[in-house]
Amino acid sequence: MENLCKNYVIAIDGEAGTGKSTLAKNIAKKYGIVYMDTGAMYRCVTLDMLNNDIDISQIDKISALLDSIKIEMINDNGEDKFLLNGIDVTKEIREKRVNDLVSQVSHVPVVRERMVDLQRKLAQGKKIVMEGRDIGTNVFPNAEVKIYLTASPEERAKRRFLQNKEKGIDIPYEEILANVIFRDNNDKNSDVAPLKKAKDAFELDTTNYTLEEVEEIVMSKVKEKVDINV
């Protein structure tokens, strides 16, 4: 055991649709630590840009938008909800128009810079689990625990399709699969904080594992690094 009775960061990175958010939420709920969905933060920025007809090439307008934007995550009777400038946008940030643009928005340097700064501030003085694309490599390179999740594109598209169906969001499987492949290419080849495994991260291919099995494997690694029960 390396760290006792102290604040720590559990960084969960990986490809879109690998179960990062669900895993992070479950860990946070089970062990009473703070959960931060960094992907939803970028989705909020994307939605705000769309609502204000701002293109990703309009850097000055994006910067001005970021100066006034307010992103909050609240827990409403056990359900995580996201507020954009005081309005509940939990469902809107999962719409197709956001899905199609969020990867590009997250590659805009000024957006990445502002969101990383915000994530670091929100994590100060806390025991926290964060998931995203570059938590262990860029946001918190010294995180006590680093996990990297992968899965086949087909399995990830299937999971996203079923999640959307539960939320009443109707997007065809083929369209989701195309978006997953597109995002993989964008995320891994980005000039700004590309998706990659940290050298000291534990990598797990979740394709053939249930969520419960993934959680069990990951938690065994977490407990090697921190006393999460403290």
Can you describe what each PLM-predicted range is?
Residues 10-12:
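Hydrophobic anchor at the beta1->P-loop junction of P-loop NTPases
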Residues 23:
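Hydrophobic positions on the alpha1 helix immediately C-terminal to the Walker A/P-loop
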Residues 20:
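Conserved lysine of the Walker
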Residues 15:
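P-loop (Walker A) phosphate-binding loop of NTP-binding proteins
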Residues 74, 119-126, 133, 137-138, ...:
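Small-molecule kinase domains that catalyze NTP-dependent phosphoryl transfer to phosphate-bearing small molecules
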Residues 90-102, 106-166:
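ATP-dependent NMP and nucleoside kinases share a basic, alpha-helical "lid"
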Residues 30-95:
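N-terminal phosphate/diphosphate-binding loop that engages ATP/GTP or pyrophosphate donors
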Residues 39, 86, 115, 129, ...:
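Residue-level signal for inorganic ion chemistry
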